[in-house]
C-alpha cells in the first residue's frame, strides 16, 4: 500500500510517502513538492523491486506518514520507528548497520562514515553504500552520518540533510 501526507515544519512543507504492507517497506519525502516526490518514489520502487520486495501500490491512508513525521520532530524515537520497519529485502549487513545507527546516533548528533565503520569493523565505503541504499530515511537516520571532508553528501539532496539536522537541533 502507499500512503502520503503533507506536514508543515520550520515554515516548509514536507510530503512524506510510505510504502507498507505488514510494516514499512520504504519511505520517501520531499521538500520540493509532488514532482520531486514522484521521482523519489520511482527510485524507491525500482530499488525495492530489485531486492525482491513484493509491493502493492494501492493508495490507502495509514498511520505511517505521521509516524515518520513524529520521528523527525522527536515526538517518538528512532528506535520506536524502527520497530515498524519490515526490513524485507535488506542484507544482514544493512540490518546490522541500520540497527547500530538507530541505537547509537541520537537526535542532534552526527558521526563520520569512518567512525561508524570502525565501530562495525568494516570500511567507510561499505557504510556509505549502506547509507545510500537506505529505504527508510528519517527513521534510519542516514542524514546523521557525515563525510570527514564533505559532510553534506546526501541522497536526494545536500540541502535535505542540512534541513533534517536543523530540525533535530544539530549545530555545526
Swiss-Prot record:
Active-site positions on this chain: 142
GO cellular component, one term: cytoplasm
Any Pfam family matching the protein: DNA_binding_1
Domain of life: Archaea
Location within or outside the cell: Cytoplasm
InterPro entries, A to Z: DNA_protcyst_Mta_Thcoc, MethylDNA_cys_MeTrfase_AS, MethylDNA_cys_MeTrfase_DNA-bd, MethylDNA_cys_MeTrfase_DNAb, MGMT_N, MGMT_N_sf, WH-like_DNA-bd_sf
RNA-binding in keyword set: no
Molecular function, one GO term: methylated-DNA-[protein]-cysteine S-methyltransferase activity
EC number(s) per entry: 2.1.1.63
Top EC class, one word: transferase
Gene Ontology terms: biological process: DNA repair; methylation
Main location group: cytoplasm
Matching CDD domains: ATase
Catalytic activity: a 6-O-methyl-2'-deoxyguanosine in DNA + L-cysteinyl-[protein] = S-methyl-L-cysteinyl-[protein] + a 2'-deoxyguanosine in DNA; a 4-O-methyl-thymidine in DNA + L-cysteinyl-[protein] = a thymidine in DNA + S-methyl-L-cysteinyl-[protein]
Keyword line: Cytoplasm, DNA damage, DNA repair, Methyltransferase, Transferase
NCBIfam families noted in UniProt: DNA_protcyst_Mta_Thcoc (NF041132), ogt (TIGR00589), PRK03887.1 (NF003022)
Note: This enzyme catalyzes only one turnover and therefore is not strictly catalytic. According to one definition, an enzyme is a biocatalyst that acts repeatedly and over many reaction cycles.
Similarity field: Belongs to the MGMT family.
Summary of the function given for this chain in its UniProt record: Involved in the cellular defense against the biological effects of O6-methylguanine (O6-MeG) and O4-methylthymine (O4-MeT) in DNA. Repairs the methylated nucleobase in DNA by stoichiometrically transferring the methyl group to a cysteine residue in the enzyme. This is a suicide reaction: the enzyme is irreversibly inactivated.
Protein's recorded name: Methylated-DNA--protein-cysteine methyltransferase
Lineage per the UniProt record: Archaea, Methanobacteriati, Methanobacteriota, Thermococci, Thermococcales
